[in-house]
Swiss-Prot record:
UniProt-listed GO biological process terms: protein catabolic process; proteolysis
Superkingdom assignment: Bacteria
Family named by the database record: Belongs to the ClpS family.
The protein's name: ATP-dependent Clp protease adapter protein ClpS
Pfam families the record matches: ClpS
Disulfide pattern: none
Organism: Leptothrix cholodnii (strain ATCC 51168 / LMG 8142 / SP-6)
Entries under InterPro entries matching the protein: ClpS (IPR022935), ClpS_core (IPR003769), Ribosomal_bL12_C/ClpS-like (IPR014719)
Functional description taken from the UniProt entry: Involved in the modulation of the specificity of the ClpAP-mediated ATP-dependent protein degradation.
Stretches that traverse the bilayer: none
Length: 115
């Protein structure tokens, strides 16, 4: 038999306090914030403005004035951001808006985009 040492990586021993107790080193980890997504509502020629305002109030918690301003931006510019959320929340909001529009018989479209 040979007197070879097992092939182990060169790992430094953990620091100790001089009395045999190992001192744990704290390592800071950078955690990236979650990506955020804009929920965007698109204009169409058929969905009533009142329905759009109601959706903005109900699903995005905008007050009447803010909901009306967003609705007008959708109407005049063709689209507007309703809110910015994490991916799961944004996807849920899009589905809720589209489901409400389908139930009401409106073609209202809502999408999400990386903010």
């Amino acid at each position: 038999m040979s007197d070879q040492k097992p092939n182990t990586p060169n790992v430094p021993a953990p620091p100790d306090d001089g009395q045999g107790a190992v001192i744990a080193e704290k390592q800071l980890q950078r955690v990236e914030p979650p990506r955020v997504y804009q929920v965007v509502m698109l204009n169409d020629d058929f969905t009533p403005m009142e329905f759009v305002v109601m959706v903005l109030q109900q699903f995005f918690r905008h007050d009447l004035e803010a909901a009306t301003q967003i609705m007008l931006k959708i109407h005049h510019e063709g689209r507007a951001v309703c809110g910015v959320y994490t991916q799961d929340v944004a996807a849920t909001k899009v589905e809720m808006v589209q489901a409400a529009a389908r139930r009401a018989g409106h073609p209202l479209q809502c999408t999400m985009e990386v903010a």
